[in-house]
Amino acid sequence: MWELVALLLLTLAYLFWPKRRCPGAKYPKSLLSLPLVGSLPFLPRHGHMHNNFFKLQKKYGPIYSVRMGTKTTVIVGHHQLAKEVLIKKGKDFSGRPQMATLDIASNNRKGIAFADSGAHWQLHRRLAMATFALFKDGDQKLEKIICQEISTLCDMLATHNGQSIDISFPVFVAVTNVISLICFNTSYKNGDPELNVIQNYNEGIIDNLSKDSLVDLVPWLKIFPNKTLEKLKSHVKIRNDLLNKILENYKEKFRSDSITNMLDTLMQAKMNSDNGNAGPDQDSELLSDNHILTTIGDIFGAGVETTTSVVKWTLAFLLHNPQVKKKLYEEIDQNVGFSRTPTISDRNRLLLLEATIREVLRLRPVAPMLIPHKANVDSSIGEFAVDKGTEVIINLWALHHNEKEWHQPDQFMPERFLNPAGTQLISPSVSYLPFGAGPRSCIGEILARQELFLIMAWLLQRFDLEVPDDGQLPSLEGIPKVVFLIDSFKVKIKVRQAWREAQAEGST
């Protein structure tokens, strides 16, 4: 009996002990590792993972490896090495590792965000980027769409004049409508129950993707019941059912001679492929309804929660730093005034606001650790070998909080992005990648930057944004999920007297 147990343990140890493919190669320094559990017993048990990995750099250097369950993962925490992974060797490291939770969220590795590199990922990324090009000019200009939704947002907030409210849902509605217009040319009215459905499944997917699921680290655990996976499947099904309903309804009104949104772009690509009018890289099988709705789901998931979260982080930092907020009001008043609403061209004038947004993205990046990459081939990072199939994580938190790159990195200092005179935006460090880089960079970066600037400019022009009467400031600790969330908080909304007077003058 004991001989069999010993044999089983030795077999498991052999199967799950990390192996080197190139005996003479130099690999990154590694944390201690045990069979089956890997380095898990030796990782810090408290605190945010991105910060714990950052602290481990002091002992192991800017690149090191950990054995996460049965997988070897390389952690990269320096901008030069990160750019090598993302840009210089972007093709080598453009893969996505297979993980149980990501497979569920991506309908078995479809879409863009969690799909492995290959023909389907390249095709859908290219089509998504082509869609954003539709919104450069004319009636569909991105700025026009964003501003019409912000106008509705501001009108709604004005009805809460003098009240302390959580602005999460109002901002969520505005950002959701922008994405919906880009994807379907439709938007939701306030009170539409579908908005709550979208918010609930978004939150459910983000929450369950981010839980410390052993099944992602030890894949064979999938054979056992798993509450996290079941909850994730439930939320993904709700998302898929909703998007499938939208897709089926849209098919009836699709016109191939009028391509105006993302769904049009994807459906036209499928039609061309079915008719033999597409290139060899545009296989019809890669444009099934399931592929299409997963890509739309990715755009919704990435575009809504990220922007909403950054707006809330920005407001939170301004409530904590009233002196910066005061300067922003002065900048708005002097450069925009109250006779017109802010436009994207005001980015050249509202430099402190732009610097503030950049500083928020540095201090609280949307994703403190980028979605894991995977080595598609045997490659290297710096002087170290990286075997094919190895998972690579870019610790963006480490890049953005490196004391050698940033003066007082934990302090909120928007002025670091301005020259001493405050008349020009600057790049104080190359260790700054808020939207990633290379083949896997965020395709919605332009949209996100426009939304963040315009939302904040409009809010600051119209409202005094104050700490509630109870004096409760937002927590800046954060909740690290797939997106770095902030705890719910309230802000006191007061319509600015100068704005009110300007509107009264304009109506006479």
From Swiss-Prot:
Changing R347H: In AH5; selectively ablates 17,20-lyase activity, while preserving most 17alpha-hydroxylase activity. Its cofactor is heme. Its EC number is 1.14.14.19, 1.14.14.32. Heme binds at C442. Phosphorylation is necessary for 17,20-lyase, but not for 17-alpha-hydroxylase activity. Pathway: Steroid hormone biosynthesis; Steroid biosynthesis; glucocorticoid biosynthesis. Keywords: Congenital adrenal hyperplasia, Disease variant, Endoplasmic reticulum, Heme, Iron, Lipid metabolism, Lyase, Membrane, Metal-binding, Microsome, Monooxygenase, Oxidoreductase, Phosphoprotein, Steroidogenesis. It is found in: Endoplasmic reticulum membrane; Microsome membrane. A cytochrome P450 monooxygenase involved in corticoid and androgen biosynthesis. Catalyzes 17-alpha hydroxylation of C21 steroids, which is common for both pathways. A second oxidative step, required only for androgen synthesis, involves an acyl-carbon cleavage. The 17-alpha hydroxy intermediates, as part of adrenal glucocorticoids biosynthesis pathway, are precursors of cortisol. This is Steroid 17-alpha-hydroxylase/17,20 lyase. It comes from Homo sapiens (Human). The lineage of its organism: Eukaryota, Metazoa, Chordata, Craniata, Vertebrata.
